[in-house]
């Protein structure tokens, strides 16, 4: 029996990364899910990531830790900075975590090299997104170039491909794709300030994009919201 090619999938526990995991599985790849505890205030997403990894048949799921909260600079890691509850007026919002995707992709790259995996999946999106600089196609292309210059696998002729299959999709299109692939979005948590039970605030930018996406897709929103 031929071994399936391997892929490392960054899995936050949210809607987009769950869809990425389903896409990688649908491509016939053996999936290894990597979640990162980086000091985020919405730690319920890590619990969600375990549910999603199990439901979508990841070969292995690991939760790695890195203390981005030590540096602060983001509403997601610094409790002194409030999470905005209105749509961002433009520019890079305070929910941007400095260098987060660079750090996480580097961790995924390290595990991929150990596994002999030539594919890394990340759920960044440049359409319905919040203005983050590390969610753009130029960033993904630049990271892939760096990855193949900086690793033993790359210089020995075994290049790594960084897949960002959602990058040009609307949130509604992402949801439709995931539903077609059997993703149970009721298992996921997107909210920036979800409570310990994973219930969403319904007011932050992540909640707004998620709610609007389900509405535009014409699909019932399975999100559990906190009582107001």
UniProtKB/Swiss-Prot annotation:
InterPro entries, per the entry: QueC, Rossmann-like_a/b/a_fold
Cofactor(s) required for function per UniProt: Zn(2+)
Record's keyword annotation contains S-adenosyl-L-methionine: no
Catalysis performed (reactions): 7-carboxy-7-deazaguanine + NH4(+) + ATP = 7-cyano-7-deazaguanine + ADP + phosphate + H2O + H(+)
UniProt cofactor note: Binds 1 zinc ion per subunit.
Family of the protein in this entry: Belongs to the QueC family.
Protein EC: 6.3.4.20
Amino-acid positions noted as binding Zn(2+) in the UniProt annotation, renumbered to this chain: 191, 201, 204, 207
Biological process terms in GO annotation: queuosine biosynthetic process
Gene behind the chain: queC
Organism, scientific name: Azoarcus sp. (strain BH72)
MF annotations from Gene Ontology: ATP binding; ligase activity, forming carbon-nitrogen bonds; zinc ion binding
CDD domains: QueC-like (cd01995)
Taxonomic lineage of the native organism: Bacteria, Pseudomonadati, Pseudomonadota, Betaproteobacteria, Rhodocyclales
Signal sequence annotation: none
Protein name stated in the entry: 7-cyano-7-deazaguanine synthase
Binding site for ATP: 11-21
């Amino acid at each position: 029996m031929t071994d399936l090619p391997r892929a490392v999938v960054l899995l936050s526990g949210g809607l987009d990364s769950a869809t990425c995991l389903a896409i990688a599985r649908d491509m016939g790849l053996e999936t290894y899910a990597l979640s990162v505890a980086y000091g985020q205030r919405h730690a319920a997403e890590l619990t969600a990531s375990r549910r999603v990894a199990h439901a979508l048949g990841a070969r292995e799921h690991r939760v790695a830790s890195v203390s981005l909260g030590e540096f602060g600079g983001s509403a997601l890691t610094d409790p002194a900075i409030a999470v905005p509850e209105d749509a961002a007026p433009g520019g890079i919002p305070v929910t941007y975590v400095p260098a987060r995707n660079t750090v996480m992709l580097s961790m995924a790259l390290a595990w991929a090299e150990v596994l002999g995996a030539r594919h890394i999946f990340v759920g960044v999106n440049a359409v319905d997104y919040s203005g983050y600089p590390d969610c753009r196609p130029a960033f993904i292309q630049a990271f892939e170039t760096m990855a193949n210059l900086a690793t033993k696998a790359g210089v020995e002729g075994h290049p790594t491909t960084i897949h960002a299959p959602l990058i040009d999709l609307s949130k509604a299109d992402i949801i439709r794709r995931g539903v077609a692939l059997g993703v149970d979005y009721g298992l996921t948590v997107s909210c920036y300030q979800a409570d310990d039970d994973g219930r969403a605030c319904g007011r932050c930018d992540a909640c707004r994009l998620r709610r609007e996406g389900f509405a535009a897709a014409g699909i019932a929103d399975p999100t559990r919201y906190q009582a107001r």
